[in-house]
Amino acid sequence: MQGTPDYYDMINIGFGPAGIALACALEEAAHRPLETGQCLFLDKHPNCAWHPEFLLDGTDINHHLLRDLVTPRNPQSRHSFAMYLKEHGRLYQFGLLGRPASRNEWSDYVAWVGKAFASHVHYEEEVLEIRPVTEDGEIQLLLVMTSRGQYLTRNLVLSSGSTPNIPSQFEQMDCARVIHTSRYLSSLEGLDRQAAWAFAVVGSGQSAGESIIDLLNRFPNAQVTSIHRSSGFKIAQLGQFPNQAFHPDRVAYFHKLGQAEKAMILEEVKSTNYSGIDVDESQALYSLFYEGLVSNQPRLALKIFTHIESASQTPDKLILHTCDPYTLERSSVEADYVFLGTGYKQDYVPPLLSQLQPWLSLGSDNGVQVEQNYRLTTAPSFRPAIFVNGLSERSHGIGEGQSFSLLAMRAGILTHSLF
């Protein structure tokens, strides 16, 4: 180690929407902790683009525009979506649009807010390791080791987002031909648009459905096989009453429940955020399916009640070995490329905390225990504070998953706890 690492009162890992919302809350706090220069945000990416690999034409956000980075916490914030529209001269025009913001526009909004904090962010700096610093028999500080240097802190916030969910059958496969939707657009670069590709898409949620529509439109001679463990695509629960699951008041109720009760509630409300598509997407998918029947040239095949038992590959094909769990009939699907619309997962213990695990309190599910203010429960001899920002669905409810619903409110709670 050359010299003493720089010290920061807070280091936040990840500068996507959760990290940006925290920066907004810190800036707007009465004591202005950002102005002291003692808050550092680290991100391994070159910018703060929101889902850049899945910004597909014709797609829009599936939450209300008031659930932006700041409005639920501070409706007067300069970082609201309304202020973004005003700054770009589109406020009145957007009011006439009659539909949600497009995903491209929402990504531009997120980037617009992120740019306001450029002086506090180190982009393209990946956190490699976090080590405990011991003094007088206790852990006093954390040493954050990155691709560029080292830093010390007493307060660490993980805003690093969820991990792509890769089913075990595909973990050892050629990643150039088995593609999670988190790598979707870049994986298509260089593919012949006119070739008669055989694509397989795994999953029953929004990303799977949107992938199918895009592939069929982008590659007019391609065939797509849509593979589902269940009975196929279903409409997500978009009604007002089911979506009260995302209300901030539900967090305290959910947090005090036992692990078994939490699991039951998550199972009950998952259709509000997972494994569902919206009405427009369902209509588009079925239209593509039906047009194939009319023309007698079907390009979309649906395989329901299909469990992928294993996958293998030849020099030029991927082969998915499947089984119907009810009839036990086995079959196979051959494809040039397999796209995984299988969503994301939250690790029970974030990998970056592996060296700190001896001091972390684990629950009955062997996951980190998260207090209501998002601080991890640690041993008495562990003095630093570690907070999770968007990684606490199992402890706080479905609003803490892949959703903007609680971003702003959570950022306010974190700011109060940190400073």
For the regions a protein language model found, what residue spans apply to each?
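Short, solvent-exposed coil/turn linker segments
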Residues: P33, D57-L69, H180, D324
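Tryptophan-centered motif/residue detector
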Residues: W50, F81-Y84, W112
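Flavin (primarily FAD) cofactor-binding/catalytic cores of flavoenzymes
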Residues: M1-P46, G95-Q206, E210-S231, I235-F419
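A short alpha-helix-loop-beta-strand transition element characteristic
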Residues: E53, N74, F94-L97
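N-terminal beta-loop-helix "entrance" segment that forms/cooperates
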Residues: W50-G58
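Charge- and polar-rich, low-complexity intrinsically disordered segments of small proteins and propeptides
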Residues: N47-A49, P72
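Flavin (FAD/FMN) cofactor-binding and adjacent substrate-gating region
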Residues: T59-Y92, R250-L257, E261
